[in-house]
């Protein structure tokens, strides 16, 4: 059994830069982007790209998974710096941005699936874990309702993302996210008349 050696610092920077450029390029230009163009924009040679990602599908898959990891891994930093309800609202903005990127990469991701890959295998679990962490923090602080399931919130977020997918509707997405967060707050008991 072989173990992967950690990348040298320069190799890690090159890999990270390739992933960043790939997300932007595939999101903007779709599947027509050449790997040569990705390598050139990343400031590396095509051989460096192929050392990290032997196929186009490997690059697309890694870029998608990297974006998912960045989104989910941001939860701890958000909770460290913001009250839980604000951390959730900020994360929800990032989710909408993430789904916009994913849609832009749609054709490239379909090619990964057609070649036998499954870029979505870990998405649901990672997203559910991230949302559960945010909800539990807000519930513990008393700023979010205790009866909200992470899966339900993800469905709501996905619906908002689909309904406001164009950049022109991004402002509307923000307003809808505000409404969703307001619905997550604990209900105030009103004395009966």
Question: At which residue positions do the language-model features occur?
Answer:
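Basic, helix-initiating cap at the start of DNA-binding domains
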Residues: 1-41, 58-61
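Hydrophobic alpha-helical connector segments
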Residues: 62, 73-101, 116-119
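Short hydrophobic/aromatic patch on the recognition helix
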Residues: 43-53
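C-terminal peripheral helix-coil segments that are non-catalytic and often amphipathic
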Residues: 1-3, 129, 133-141, 166-193
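Short linear capping/connector segments at secondary-structure termini
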Residues: 107-116
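Hydrophobic/aromatic residues within well-ordered alpha-helical segments
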Residues: 14, 67, 71, 92-95, ...
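Helix-turn-helix/winged-helix DNA-binding modules
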Residues: 30-31, 51, 145
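Amphipathic alpha-helical packing segments from all-alpha helical-bundle domains
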Residues: 69, 101, 115-143, 148-151, ...
């Amino acid at each position: 059994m072989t173990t992967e050696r950690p990348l040298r610092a320069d190799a890690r920077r090159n890999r990270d830069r390739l992933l960043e450029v790939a997300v932007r390029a595939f999101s903007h230009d779709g599947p027509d982007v050449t790997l040569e163009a990705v390598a050139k924009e990343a400031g590396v040679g095509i051989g460096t790209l192929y050392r990290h990602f032997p196929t186009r599908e490997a690059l697309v898959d890694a870029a998608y998974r990297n974006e998912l990891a960045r989104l989910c891994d941001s939860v701890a930093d958000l909770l460290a710096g913001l009250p839980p309800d604000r951390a959730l609202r900020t994360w929800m903005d990032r989710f909408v941005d993430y789904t916009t990127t994913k849609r832009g990469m749609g054709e490239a991701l379909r090619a990964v699936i057609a070649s036998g890959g499954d870029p979505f295998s870990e998405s649901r679990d990672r997203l559910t874990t991230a949302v559960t962490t945010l909800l539990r923090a807000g519930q513990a602080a008393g700023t979010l309702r205790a009866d909200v399931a992470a899966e339900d919130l993800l469905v709501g977020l996905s619906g908002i993302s689909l309904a406001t997918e164009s950049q022109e509707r991004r402002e509307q997405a923000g307003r809808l996210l505000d409404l969703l967060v307001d619905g997550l707050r604990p209900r105030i008991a009103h004395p009966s008349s």
